[in-house]
Structure formats: structure tokens, C-alpha cells
């Protein structure tokens, strides 16, 4: 009954996520104007809710609710997407050359759909030439200084206009004055051109002298060897271009002085790199755009050739009596709404209905299948055995085509090389960044703008490679969506002792599932990893709330996961339950991509522990038994 009571309560965060999901679906369906409206409506709703909460807490003298930070983050994401959609509306609108197919329910995605070159087939991504045009639009809008000859041409046009006006005012009888004006005009125009040509030659000579001088400085900075690779030659040319840029601008000198005065200030590093990449005429910012276009052009054909849709869109043959998984046309990863089931679920609720981890006599269709599950006390102790079985099954049932794997490896290598080039060039330009802490912060600041336009396409390729695993995970999510927490292996001591008091949250660890759902809104590996860390911290906080430990001592700041009250044997079943409730099979591909692109230094600390725990939970959920469910 308590679960039923919880069904009627819809949290504002859930409603806000539903609004954002609807806007993303419109954006995916090539309806940018409607999507822009829905993004603004989502922001307005979140602002209204937070304003009401502030007024309520002001009257009651309470603290800020815990969902406020999530609401603000969701509003920030909606605002960024609204800005992106508004920019697209102001640029070239692509017109379809063929009529669209019959409408099919589309999962949410990051980019609007346009027509690709492959026979009118729908593609969720912009063609490379359009992507390159959008990336270069900002740099083309930069102010360009006029050359001396161009300035002289403008001056001569003004002189000619003044001459024609004076000639129109003279009488036909004033022939001598007309001749004088004509000769004067010709003399002035010729003088302007001669002076401009001399200035241009002098300027070109000085520019060439400066270029040679800066090239020599760049050569001295690098090791002097006769045979240079193309990459080394380009690196020298870029460094010389940076030196030339610094000759014409003063701000790099000021920033270098700031770094010298405050060598350990990481906020200064963040501000510097953000400012640097925001200037479209800086050589490093220009290199970033060129590398983005190169990676995008390499990814686009590989993703376009992956014609088969991704899970929950490429279902395996279902067992008799079981339901087929919902097909989809998109390779995107954005908050795919689950298929309506025979058991009604409220539209405003999270991906699964609130459940009561209560008595054994639950009417859930999984109530009689607990015996078919692994023993909840020992299931996670044998996790290595399950993971080994998963690897063997993966090798046996669906080896990916070699070309697709090779395309992924090539793309990953190109991305690593691109990021390394950007980082090394930035460290060359600003020597004050060449410390361990500053280098890590600089890398994080470079990765965010670099990955933002590329991540949806990159993830689509990962999803096509991991389609079989995502299908298995999607099927487990479908079969176990109503499973009580105890059936997944969560001990009762780590569940709410007074479920009626927790009715508003819907189900145990609901906050962790909501936080994990925010991961797909990010487009930077570092921010995605931070979302995973927050998810596990929320799990630990919820577990301590459900089962407080008297010996726990307060400590400043958020405790590391390893120091939490629950151990790995308790954390993994809880995390598996959270994964089931997230309804996001694309987490398999997200984690595979994060493991590849996260810096090694993070993988040996708390972040690496959290990522490994999530991967273990995903592998376990994939292998949940199928027997006894098709009744």
C-alpha cells in the first residue's frame, strides 16, 4: 500500500526530466523550433519550482532541498541546448530531398535529424561539410585588418564620389575647372596607389623578416634535426604562428605574468585555457576546430554505415511468451523513454514504478522467481565467475565485424593524438602550465570543448560495436523492472526500515538512479565520470540513512567511496538495482568510452573505483537469469 501511495507523488525533478526529454525528442525529430520552445518551457518550469522552494524554505527556515543542485544542472543543460538550437535556427536550414518515411517513435538524441547522402536514409547527425561550415562560421566572422592597397582603394572611391558630385554642380561653360578637377583627381588617386604600394612592400618585407626570426626561435625551441616528420614540421609552424600572434596581442604576456605570480592557482589555469579557446583567431583555437572537423569526418562514414539501429533498438529473437524490445531508429544515447508495458505506469514517474521492498507475497510477476536468482548472500562474491562467463558468451555469440572494430580503434587513436597535440602546443605557448596539477587541469579544460560536438557521434560508434551487450542489458532491464530490491541481492538492513515514510521517493535509492540518468546529458568524459562518482556517493549516503552506523564519525567534505560504511559486497547489488531502474542500456557504451578516454591518473583513484564498480554492476545485470520469467 505504501508503494501505491508513493505512485501518486511526482517529484518536481521527475517532471523536469520529462519536459527535457520531450524537448530532446523534438530536437532529434528535426523540429528545432518546437524543441527550442520546449527547452525554454523546461527552464521556466525549473525556475518556477526553485523559486517556490526558496520562498517556502525562507518561511519555514529550512535548508535548501537536496534536489536543487540536480534541478540547476538540468536547467543549465537545457539552456545550453536551447542556445545550440537557436544558433541552428539562425543558420542554413537543410531541406529534405526525399519524403520522410512513416513516423516512428524516436528516442531522444543530441542533434536534429537531417538527410544523409545514402539514399535518403535518415541520419541523426549533420554531414561533415555542414559541421565544418558551422565550426568555421565563428572564425570567418573575425575582423580582418585592411592592407595598405585596400585602404588606398577605399580612399580613391571616396575621392571619385566627391569628384562626381562637384562635376555635377559645374555649368557646361566651366570646362577649364572640369579639366582641373579631373587632373587633380587622377594625381591624388595615383599618389595614393604609389604610397600604398610602397607601404605594402615595406610591410611585407618586415613581416617576412619577423616570420624568419620567429621561425628561428621556434627551431631553437625544438631539437634541431635534418629529417623532420610532417607532424614535427606542423608543430614548429604552429608554434611560430603562436609567437607571431603574441607579437600582435598583449594579453598572452599578461597571463604569463599572472601564472608566474600564482603558479599553484588552478582557477587561473581554467580561466586562461577558456579564454584562449574562445578566441577564434588564436592558432590553438584554430587547430582545435581543424582537429574536430578531421575527427568528425572520420567518424561520420563509420556511423552512417552502421545501418542497424542500436538497443533498445536491435532486439534479439525473443523467447516464447516474452515481449519484443522496442525498435528505434537512432544510435543516440539520450534518455530513451521505456516502452509502455502491460502494467500501467504513470508518465511522470521515473523509468520504473515505485516498488515496496516488502513482504514475499508481492503480486509482482517476479515474486516466484527469486529461487531462480543467484543466492542474494553470495551472488556478488562470485562476481569474477560471472564476468568470465560474460566474456566467453560475448566471444561466442556475436563477434563484431572486424572493419567496425578497426574503425573504432582508428577513431580512438586519432582522438588521442588530437588531444595530445592540443595539450603539448598549449604547454609550449604557456610554460607556466608545465606542472603536474596545471597539466591535468589544462587537459580537462581542453577536453570539454573538444568532445562536446564529437561525443554523440563517437558514442554512436561505440553503441554499434557494443550492440549485443546493450541488447542483453536492455532485456534484463525489461524483465527485472518490477523486481524487488531483495531479489537483486540487496540485504534488508540496507533498505528503508519505515517504507511509508519514504513514499515520496518512489523506491529505494531513487536519488542515485536520477543522478545516474543525468550522465547521458553530459558530453565530456570528465563530467560523466564525476556524475558516476556522485551516484555512488549518493548510494552510500542513502545506505547510511537506511542503516545508520553509530561508529561513523563525521569528517569534512564528501568521504571517499572506499571509506563509506558499506563494502563492495553491499555496494554492487545496490548499484545493480540502480542500473536496472535507470533504464539506460547505453551505459555499457558510455563506460567503455570513459575507460578509453579518462586519464590514467584518475583510474587508480576514487574515480577508477567508481567506474569499475559500475562496469561490474552492468556485467552482472546482463547475466541475470532468464529462466522462469517467460510465464
From Swiss-Prot:
SMART domains: VPS9
Region (Disordered): 318-379
Keyword Transferase in annotation: no
Biological processes, Gene Ontology terms: proton motive force-driven ATP synthesis; vesicle-mediated transport
GO CC terms, sorted: cytosol; endocytic vesicle
Tissue expr: Ubiquitous.
Domain (VPS9) ranges: 467-630
Annotated keywords: Coiled coil, GTPase activation, Phosphoprotein
Name of one Pfam family that matches: VPS9
Coiled-coil region: 187-221
Keyword Cell inner membrane recorded: no
Modified residues (Phosphoserine): 116
One Gene Ontology molecular-function label: small GTPase binding
Pro residues compositional bias, start-end: 337-362
PANTHER family: RAB GDP/GTP EXCHANGE FACTOR, VPS9 DOMAIN-CONTAINING PROTEIN 1
The protein's name in its UniProt record: VPS9 domain-containing protein 1
UniProt organism field: Homo sapiens
Name of the gene encoding the protein in the UniProt record: VPS9D1
